[in-house]
């Protein structure tokens, strides 16, 4: 009997990379593997994608793990470097780095490096989080072009704030700012992440940066979901029934007695809970798959267990398989039911959840 286990489907991951190439055929792809590859395993994910043009990470430590694991493709530090003392390592490991503020620029100008580094100047086109403001961007760019520690030409990157809201006008405005600044400049350009790839083909440019969609999960809050775009879920969160019991009409279930059965039924208990990272906020009615059949969660999610209503005629037994999300049950459905984003669901699973890789 298997308790909480994440099953990672390498074949689906490779399929999704190919699907991204179909959607952005003129662009190279930075496969974003930050946050332990969105919960899928940093090194295993990168090794599964030898055809990725580059990888994107949030921390230098992630990049160094990839290099130590034999990954030779370009690796982009999406948030840049946090300490000037990291620059010699970035140079020696042939890493690419975003540069988005005056402190980073000054550090690049002051350091002595054996080899220059490849730089992506981050332009703030409307996210207002990281990046150089448009009115300061030209002077910043010129300093980078004259910096001996920067490999030329300087590349330009930005990030959409509302790519998943195609009617709001914000993305067009960001594109206008980005295009105006990039005009006539020789470096590579990148602004599209998952939402841009799916909804804004005019934003694909030289490089696109698929994140959550690489793993078969849509960045959109509502339908269409990943499978609707031709992607396959890479992660399946699975477990088993540890008990099946008769349950009488009128009896409550679990802490607080928040769910009371209206009929005699069969109740299943699943070895899964918020101690594994499953959302405690999941309400009664949230679906799971038992033996491939959709059944509802009933009562509160506990630390180690979830109860499900198997139905009065159920023939399920202890030890039978359960899928909490993944193949046959998109995680986007769970996100919609629980009001917890799919990003958070797949990245917050705890260390007691086993990981298994299949082809």
UniProtKB/Swiss-Prot annotation:
One of its GO terms (cellular component) is cytosol. One of its GO terms (molecular function) is alanine racemase activity. Optimum pH is 8.5. The modification N6-(pyridoxal phosphate)lysine is found at residue 34. The active site is at 34 (proton acceptor), 255 (proton acceptor). SUPFAM superfamilies: Alanine racemase C-terminal domain-like (SSF50621), PLP-binding barrel (SSF51419). The keyword Isomerase applies. InterPro entries: Ala_racemase, Ala_racemase/Decarboxylase_C, Ala_racemase_C, Ala_racemase_N, Ala_racemase_pyridoxalP-BS, PLP-binding_barrel. Pfam families: Ala_racemase_C, Ala_racemase_N. One of its GO terms (biological process) is peptidoglycan biosynthetic process. Pathway: Amino-acid biosynthesis; D-alanine biosynthesis; D-alanine from L-alanine: step 1/1; Cell wall biogenesis; peptidoglycan biosynthesis. CDD domains: PLPDE_III_AR_proteobact. Substrate binds at residues 129, 303. It catalyses: L-alanine = D-alanine. Catalyzes the interconversion of L-alanine and D-alanine. Provides the D-alanine required for cell wall biosynthesis. Belongs to the alanine racemase family. This is Alanine racemase, biosynthetic.
């Amino acid at each position: 009997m298997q308790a909480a286990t994440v099953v990672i489907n390498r074949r689906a991951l490779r399929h999704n990379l190919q699907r991204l190439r179909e959607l952005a055929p003129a662009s190279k792809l930075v496969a974003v593997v930050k946050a332990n590859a969105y919960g899928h395993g940093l090194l295993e994910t990168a090794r599964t994608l030898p055809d990725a043009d580059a990888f994107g990470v949030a921390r230098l430590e992630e990049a160094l793990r990839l290099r130590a694991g034999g990954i030779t493709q370009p690796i982009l530090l999406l948030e840049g470097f946090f300490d000037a003392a990291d620059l010699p390592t970035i140079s020696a490991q042939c890493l690419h780095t975003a540069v988005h503020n005056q402190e980073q620029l000054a550090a690049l100008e002051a350091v002595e490096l054996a080899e220059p580094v490849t730089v992506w100047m981050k332009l703030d086109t409307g996210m207002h989080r990281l990046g150089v403001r448009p009115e300061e961007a030209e002077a910043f760019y010129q300093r980078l072009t004259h910096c001996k520690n920067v490999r030329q030409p300087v590349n330009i990157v930005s990030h959409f704030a509302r790519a998943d809201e195609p009617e709001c006008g914000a993305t067009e405005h960001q594109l206008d700012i980005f295009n105006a600044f990039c005009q006539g400049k020789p470096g590579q350009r990148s602004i599209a992440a998952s939402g841009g790839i799916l909804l804004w083909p005019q934003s694909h440019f030289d490089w696109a940066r698929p994140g959550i969609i690489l793993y078969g999960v849509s960045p959109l809050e509502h339908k269409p979901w990943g499978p609707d775009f031709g992607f396959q879920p890479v992660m399946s969160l699975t477990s088993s029934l540890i008990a099946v019991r008769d349950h009488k009409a009128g009896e409550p279930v679990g802490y607080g007695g928040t769910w009371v059965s209206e009929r005699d039924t069969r109740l299943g208990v699943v070895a899964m809970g918020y101690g594994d990272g499953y959302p405690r906020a999941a309400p009664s009615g949230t679906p799971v798959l038992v033996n491939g059949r959709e059944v509802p969660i009933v009562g509160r999610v506990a630390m180690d267990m979830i109860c499900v209503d198997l139905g009065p005629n159920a023939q399920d037994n202890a030890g039978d398989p359960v899928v909490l999300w993944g193949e046959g049950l998109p995680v986007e459905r769970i996100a919609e039911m629980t009001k917890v984003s799919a990003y958070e669901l797949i990245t917050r699973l705890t260390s007691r959840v086993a990981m298994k890789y299949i082809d």
